[in-house]
Amino acid sequence: MSVSSRIDEALNEAVALATTVGCPPRLAEALHYSVFPGGARVRPRLCLAVAGTCGDDAPALADAAAAAIELLHCASLVHDDLPCFDDAPLRRGKPSVHQAFGERLAVLVGDAMIVLAFQTLARGATAHPERLVPLLLTIGESVGMPLGIAAGQAWECEPRVSLSAYHHAKTGSLFVAACVAGAQAAGADPAPWRGVGEYLGEAYQVADDLRDALCDVDELGKPVQRDAQLGRPSAVEELGVAGAAQRLRDLVAAAVAQVPACPGADNLKALIAGESARILPKGLAGGEV
């Protein structure tokens, strides 16, 4: 089964279990709307890629970890779009969840996805219960405090912000979790994989800053120029377009260099390179700034 099929199957199973008889119909609809169709699914793909290079001896657990990470990412998008944060009308080319279902259901479905992520992980660990606690800690730390997504969102409420700390918490933390959880799900030492996630996560946020500044709504499927409008920390504001583009290239190179020697190293490096090319604004794809 392909990686994409594994991710889709795990997410479909999780959503189906959460929306069985008894679930309020509109909440069930909002959950499905939030998860499908997905974006690039880069975080779960990264999780499964690392699990694969580490032997993937527990594919059901790796799939559950990948699905949990994607559910947490989807939850963060729903909450990020809320009127109290970005007040974004679009996400992935369609109305954001609070626009489609109202603010109350958007809050509830975001919360429900956070819970569902850990339920999914627990269900997937029945054959390897000894691996569950490390996975819970890894993935929990990536979304909570002091260095997870919640902390990253909170940095937007502070008068002074370290750009690196903001990027690491808001975006990088879940990339770290994807890499570390992939190794943990396969019963491997996760330590060598942390650096891959740290560099790749920061690279992804720098790319997002560049796309927010340089792309249009049709290209991104969501509002643009939001960093400037909301006064949020941005690599473009701090470094300029040329500086941010160079920072992105440096971070991608560092992520590739961090991939440890293993049977699937070349494939993983190719995945990182391909993803970095995908997220670059078109005008920068060939190195122009």
Language model: regions and residue ranges:
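All-alpha prenyltransferase/terpene-synthase fold signal
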Residues: 1-289
